[in-house]
């Protein structure tokens, strides 16, 4: 299946999304891009994975009681994404603005499949998604990403560590297994969906320059078409 199966980008705005394993630095890069675009005078909107108020309370309660199965977890995230698509993503795109998304459908494709969901089924669930202008994949080697997360957090959460899958009782070991499976899914999606790979081991400034160059190419192309 290719990305042409998804909603074609028929809106005047631009949608740039970042993806990657935990600890890849994607959120840092998106925040820098957001600040820069605002400073350049662009109308910019931001949307973050799993942030819809529609499902926040349900998600919190279910996580606390460890009630999620891989399928229910997947469907709740899809509900969150559908709400944000209609509320936070499509309206700005219709108005010609720039939307930056911290994680997009590829997060579901990677995490849900890593948890054992059927690959084709997960892709079918998100067929309504708008095709992004560019999907950046910040790729960090597994050991680098793991070290960044483990060294910066006192304790890994149950679902974050993949402990619900019962691969092992050790949180750090489980997290490593989980993130390894996620990275495998991202790597296979590069060709499938045309993800733009950024080397997340480079200096932050160099990654940002590369990201801005790609974004500006699309914005300048839009300006030329308008002229």
Where are these regions (language model features)?
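Conserved RecA-like P-loop NTPase ATPase core
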Residues: 22, 100, 136, 186
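Hydrophobic residues at beta-strand termini and immediately following loops
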Residues: 47, 138, 198
């Amino acid at each position: 299946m290719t990305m042409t199966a998804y909603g074609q980008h028929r809106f005047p705005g631009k949608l740039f999304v970042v993806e990657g394993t935990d600890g890849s630095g994607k959120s840092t890069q998106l925040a820098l891009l957001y600040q820069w675009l605002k400073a350049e005078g662009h109308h910019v909107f931001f949307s973050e994975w799993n942030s819809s108020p529609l499902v926040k309370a349900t998600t919190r309660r279910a996580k606390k009681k460890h009630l999620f199965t891989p399928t229910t977890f997947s469907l709740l995230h899809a509900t969150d994404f559908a709400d944000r698509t209609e509320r936070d993503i499509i309206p700005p795109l219709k108005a010609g603005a720039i939307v930056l998304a911290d994680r997009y459908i590829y997060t579901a494709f990677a995490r849900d499949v890593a948890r054992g969901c059927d690959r084709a089924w997960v892709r079918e669930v998100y067929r309504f998604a708008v095709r992004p202008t560019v999907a950046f994949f910040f790729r960090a080697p597994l050991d680098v990403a793991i070290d960044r997360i483990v060294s910066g957090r006192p304790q890994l959460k149950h679902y974050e560590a993949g402990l619900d899958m019962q691969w092992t009782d050790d949180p750090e070991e489980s997290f490593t297994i989980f993130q390894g499976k996620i990275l495998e899914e991202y790597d296979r999606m590069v060709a499938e969906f045309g993800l733009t790979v950024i080397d997340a081991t480079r200096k932050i400034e160099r990654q940002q320059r590369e990201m801005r160059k790609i974004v500006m190419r699309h914005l300048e192309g839009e300006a030329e078409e308008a002229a």
